[in-house]
Amino acid sequence: MNSALKAIIELCIEEDLLPKSLDVLEYLLSTTSIPIPACYIRMCITLLVHPEYPTSSNIQESCNWILQQVVENRSKINFDAWSFENDLSDNDMPKENYLKIFSNQCLFTQDVDYWDLIAYMSSRPPDLERWMSLMDIWLRILEIDAEENGSALMKKYMGEDLCELQDAIRICFSCFTLPQQTMESPFATSMSKAPAKTESRGSNSFEGTSRLANLGAKLLCLIWAMLPKGRFFVVHLTDAFHFLSKLDERFSKLNAKQQDLFFGNLGASNLRYCLSQYILMKGIGIGINIRHTRCEFTKQLTQLLPTSLPKNKIRQKLHLRAWVSFLGSALRESDRNFDKELFYTTLKQLYTMYQQTELVGIDRPMAILKDMLVLLDISKKLSLDKIV
């Protein structure tokens, strides 16, 4: 973008005509192929969530439209705009650095990183809805980063030598639990009067909890996609293997409802497939060889055949949920070599083992196993080529 256009945009900002500056950006996105400099993308991100800008104004609507257009037109994505590193190129810098929206008001000049933002959201603040609207867009940026940019942006968030990995896992898991107190706003230190901490209220709705859980699960999947793995198996003593062990540790501390929420939000992801294997193998003490490719599911199922349950009662419940998750993954597969008879036998054996075990709070997983059995039984009788 040439300096004349920057001057027009920043003159509007300086004269308190923010809507006019956004109109210029909207026009450029609609009619030209000119990439939007990172400083103006950061301005839109900031305006969406900054407490000093009301949610009901046209400013938020314009910023949301601009960011959505950037996502839809992938060629216009400037990943540097979403990084918390401030070494931008001259073209990505504003013409006038002194303007508040580029300096002390800007989200990217605050003393926070990406995981601090997720931690703030997981504390269910009163402005959670604003942050969720932004994070829906941000999540799409990270998904495109994984697909087309080699997860370079996520790697920046994880820090050198993955120093942020444990904090990222802890914060993502906080999206599945209810906090007692709202954290300070990411803008607290730069505002003239920092908002006081308050008890969480009004943001613990079912919708808010579901959206946060979905966010936490998707971020974990994006971290998993970033981590190097072996050709077919997750190699021991690697970051990927360490990641699964930390997830298992955190997952075991969730209550039954939270565990169901966690696995449910992982969907049909590769992370769910691999984590299920880790939990199963650890539970019965066999060598942990996690196959992250699904092309030979029958071989992996043979290795995991249920001959015993973990001795620990808590691990028994985790074990059952992991089986439900692992077998559920198989129902989505279209592998020609899929052995339905082995699957049916495994499922029946597992169901029988748990029927004979006295465990409290496993009704839902048992019901899912029963539904699978019925489905498989019908499939066998009708001789269908595919289970589903």
UniProtKB/Swiss-Prot annotation:
**GO molecular function annotations of the record:** chromatin-protein adaptor activity
* Subcellular localization(s) per the UniProt record: Cytoplasm; Nucleus; Chromosome
Q: Name one GO cellular component term.
A: Smc5-Smc6 complex
Q: Does the keyword Kinase apply?
A: no
**UniProt keyword annotation of DNA-binding present:** no
User: Which terms under GO biological process does the entry name?
Assistant: DNA damage response; double-strand break repair; double-strand break repair via homologous recombination
Q: Which UniProt keywords apply?
A: Chromosome, Cytoplasm, DNA damage, DNA recombination, DNA repair, Nucleus
Q: Which top-level group of life is the source organism from?
A: Eukaryota
Q: What is its main location?
A: cytoplasm
Q: Which InterPro entries match?
A: DNA_repair_Nse5/Nse6
Oligomer status and interactors = Component of the smc5/smc6 complex which consists of two subcomplexes, smc5-smc6-nse2 and nse1-nse2-nse4. Interacts with nse6 and rfp1.
What does the UniProt record say this protein does?
A: Acts in a DNA repair pathway for removal of UV-induced DNA damage that is distinct from classical nucleotide excision repair and in repair of ionizing radiation damage. Functions in homologous recombination repair of DNA double strand breaks and in recovery of stalled replication forks. May prevent formation of excessive Holliday junctions or assist in their resolution.
Q: What is this protein called?
A: Non-structural maintenance of chromosome element 5
Q: From which organism does this entry originate? A: Schizosaccharomyces pombe (strain 972 / ATCC 24843) (Fission yeast)
Q: What is the lineage of its organism?
A: Eukaryota, Fungi, Dikarya, Ascomycota, Taphrinomycotina
